[in-house]
Amino acid sequence: ALTADSTMVGYVRSLKIKNLKNCGTFTIPTELAEENENYARNPKSSDWTLADSYDSFSDCIEKEIQIHHKGSDPVRLSNIYKPLFVLPQKSKAWSTTPTQPVSIEEANKNHETYLEISMKLIDDGEYLFGSETEYETVYLPFNTIHMDSYHHIEGWQPGYRYVYRIYFGGGYDAEGYLIRKGTTKGTTIDTTVEEWQDE
């Protein structure tokens, strides 16, 4: 994570991904792998049949993490050696926008995915989120959909690691309204997809 501007500094206490599917049925592949017919092929998303059951997933942030601006090295909000494992899936991002707010209550009803972050964000000495003594809960639309190298839209796939880089500069409240307080910077999320490698 980084802040969106050099005048900003942030403090993150917790992060949750909300409204992801959390259970289903997995069919063990029986087809043989093309490259080695002594083994079954690797699992695919189509081997999963997901149930309509949704949950929150928390990344384990054990203490306050300070984040700095874009020119700095990114700060990890999660432990690379303790990745968060979730089921392969496509999700629908929380549909709130700066001009058409949608509440968190509606997002939960419609199973729309978002990040719930407890944090402070300071811009040039002024608190945009939180205060000296308290964290504020901020929400960001989030989805599991990305573009693959062939420009196909897909969700999370088995056998890959998905790394998200968040540039904090804004966020939404629980009613879906943009929290700005004087800043014109927004928050963006970049995705990197890597083949899974055992550490």
Regions found by a protein language model. Name each.
Residues 1-199:
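Extracytoplasmic cysteine-anchoring/structural motifs
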